[in-house]
Amino acid sequence: MCKEKIQYIEFEDFVNNTGVKESTIKRRYKKIPGVIKTKKGFRVISGTRYPYNIGNTKLENSASKRFTLLKAISKYQYISHKELRLEPQQFVDMLRDLLSAGLIQRNNLCNTYGANAYDCTQLGDEFINRTDKAAKNELINTIATAVGTFTVTVLSQVFDSAA
């Protein structure tokens, strides 16, 4: 969550931001991390997103899971390790890979459930606009390049300090 006090947005603003009917959000509020029902109505933590519809998505391998994660972040929708059928640490590692490849960035909002703490960069949005197959292949290469560059940098620093 936020380092300072938790910030809230108006329920009406959340409804407007999501593009989903108010009645649907009220009915499904328990499935939306960050929406809290009170006696006076609903409170929404800043940065809350409506869940990504993963129904027709094929999660065949890690590339398709990474692409789905990037797509959900790009659409400002909630997704977590559960929807991607991953262990929590694998999910964190995928987020770290996308972050190091420059495809996503932290958004500094209060809701950090799942991938809510991240937004797509311009490069990430460009991947989403390509065909799925081409984007998945290039996504793998981009992440591998970013991770490889990081690994080589760390190794060279280790060897330099040992010498």
Placement of each model-derived feature along the sequence:
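Minor-groove-contacting beta-hairpin "wing" of winged helix-turn-helix DNA-binding domains
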Residues: 41-47, 111-120
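Beta-hairpin "wing" of winged helix-turn-helix
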Residues: 36-39, 105-109
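C-terminal single-pass membrane-anchor helix
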Residues: 135-163
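Short amphipathic alpha-helical interface segments
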Residues: 1-4, 56-85, 89
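Polyanion-binding surface elements
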Residues: 1-22
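Short amphipathic alpha-helical interaction segments
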Residues: 21-28, 85-106, 112-115
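Short helix-start
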Residues: 29-30, 34-57
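Short, amphipathic alpha-helical interaction segments positioned at domain boundaries
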Residues: 56-57, 115-146
